[in-house]
Curated annotation (Swiss-Prot):
It comes from Rickettsia prowazekii (strain Madrid E). InterPro entries: DUF2608. Residues 279-298 have a biased composition (Low complexity). Keywords: Signal. This is Uncharacterized protein RP295.
Length: 298
């Protein structure tokens, strides 16, 4: 009986090792996999769950920039696109919308806060990757701090229980952007114009952590493949499980507005983008393990 049980367990683990990237359209499948596989085959401290928030956290803001729209709308809006895409500050449009209360923010998965809390309460390390920028943003001293507080206050999403002894890390070994670097703050990695897989790997190296099972949730198949490659080069002892989150509502045409709506929205955003300010002097101390340079902003 014991041999039969052991064989079944080994079969499960072997199937996971050989598993391709798993397609999911909701958190339900991932939650079920934890109950059936991961929680039974791994200790909590041997797991690491990484959620990439881009296109996963919030439903579409309804801004037709960097998102798919049909050819008819694109041609009608082409003159506006031509104007706004020449502005180098366009890269900050997502952060601009996040910090503006005029735009509605709605979770893509209403159960996401419970998912994060369940992982944390089970002592399973879970962190997030935000494809945004760090440092000063308009009247916000440190955007990465604002973002972590915003998620906790407004959506009860809190990643800070994971790696509490490493609540802030400035990755100044990576390339700087506007005198800022990628940052890990209270469970959230902000990539700051660096490929997410590279920042995640640097995080693992910085905290000297090699999980037995690395679980990545992302809407980007390219990122999943890249992360798998990076981990294979880092350690042959890490089992990589990738969940390709492909919620159809992300690109569902029924939510698209008419041309007048898009025209008004873009025209409203243009002056906000033009007025956007960032003021990030070089770090006085370039040591990532130095005193927390963010304390004065709390």
């Amino acid at each position: 009986m014991f041999r039969k049980f052991l064989f079944i367990q080994l079969l499960i683990v072997t199937s996971l090792v050989k598993a391709e990237i798993i397609e999911v359209d909701s958190l339900n499948k991932i939650t079920q996999d934890f109950k059936v596989n991961y929680n039974k085959n791994y200790l909590p401290q041997d797991l690491l769950v990484v959620t990439v928030l881009d296109k996963f956290l919030f439903k579409s803001f309804g801004v037709p920039i960097g998102e798919y729209i049909d050819q008819h709308r694109y041609l009608a809006l082409a003159p506006l696109f031509s104007h706004i895409n020449k502005n180098p500050k366009i890269i900050y449009i997502t952060q601009l919308i996040l910090t503006n209360n005029s735009y509605k923010k709605e979770l893509q998965e209403s159960d996401f806060p419970n998912f994060v809390n369940e992982m944390s309460n089970s002592q399973i390390p879970i962190i997030a990757v935000n494809n945004g920028f760090t440092g000063n943003f308009n009247n916000i001293p440190k955007f990465e701090i604002w973002f972590a507080d915003y998620l906790k206050k407004n959506f009860y999403i809190d990643f800070s229980k994971s790696f509490p002894n490493n609540n802030y890390i400035i990755f100044n070994n990576l390339d700087s952007f506007d005198n800022t670097y990628p940052v890990f703050y209270k469970g959230i990695l902000t990539s700051n114009n660096i490929p997410a897989s590279k920042v995640i790997l640097n995080f693992l190296i910085q905290i000297n952590f090699i999980p037995k099972c690395f679980i990545l949730i992302s809407s980007s198949r390219e990122l999943l493949r890249s992360m798998e490659f990076q981990l294979n080069n880092y350690s042959s002892n890490i089992l990589f499980i990738g969940y390709h989150y492909n919620n159809k509502s992300i690109s569902d045409d029924k939510d698209y507005k008419d041309i007048a709506y898009y025209t008004k929205m873009i025209n409203d955003l243009i002056p906000q983008i033009n007025k956007l300010k960032r003021n990030n002097p070089p770090l006085k101390n370039n040591n990532a393990k130095s005193k927390n340079s963010y304390e004065t902003y709390k």
